[in-house]
Amino acid sequence: MNMKKLAILVSAVVLSSSVSVSAMAKDTMALVVSTLNNPFFVTLKDGAEAKAKALGYDLLVLDSQNDPAKELANVEDLTVRGVKVLLINPTDSDAVGNAIAIANKAKLPVLTLDRGANKGTVVSHIASDNIAGGKMAGDFIATKLGEKAKIIQLEGIAGTSAARDRGAGFKLAADAHSFQMLASQPADFDRTKGLNVMENMLSGHGDVQGVFAQNDEMALG
C-alpha cells in the first residue's frame, strides 16, 4: 500500500474516534513497528510522523526488533506514558494478542497496520489486500512462463498475516496454472536470509524457472 495513503487512512480513523482533534492537539500517539531494519516499515514510520506533525500530534515510535517479547514490553511501557492512540504493526498475528490485551485493559485505542491481529479488540486494521497481491504475482508469473512452470517460493515470517495471506493468494494462482512447486521455505522477510535460503534451494533445484518472494527485501537478496 502507498505510504501516503496509509498515513491518510490512519489519521482518518483516529479522527473518527470519540476524542476530537482539538481536544487531542499536542497529545501523543504511539507507533510500535515490528522492525525498522526493513525499508518498508521505515517508510511507514516516516509517513505516520509527517501526518501526525501536520495534525499537531507528537508521535512516539518504538521498534520491536521482530521480537514478540520486545513488542509486549513496548506496549506495557506505552500504557504508563499516557499516549492516546496505539498504532501497531505486529511481529506475529497471534503473539500480538497479549500486547493488545494490555492496551485494551488500559482503554487505549488500537489500530493494526499491514499485519492483522488474531486476538484482542482493534479499532481498525489498515493494510493492502495480501491475498489479492499474492494471486496477482502468481498470475503474472504464468503470463511470462506459462502453465506448469517450475517455481520456488520465499516465505515471510511464519505467524504473520501478511505471509499467510500472500502465500494463500499465490497458491490460488499456482493451483490454477498447475505450477510445479519445487520448494517453499521461510526467509523471514529479510534480505540476507533471502540470499542464503535461495542459494540452498537452488543447489537442489537447478531446473527452477521462477521465484515468488513474499516481499521485496527477500527478492533483492
Predicted regions and their residues:
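N-terminal secretory signal peptides that target proteins for export/translocation
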Residues: 1-3
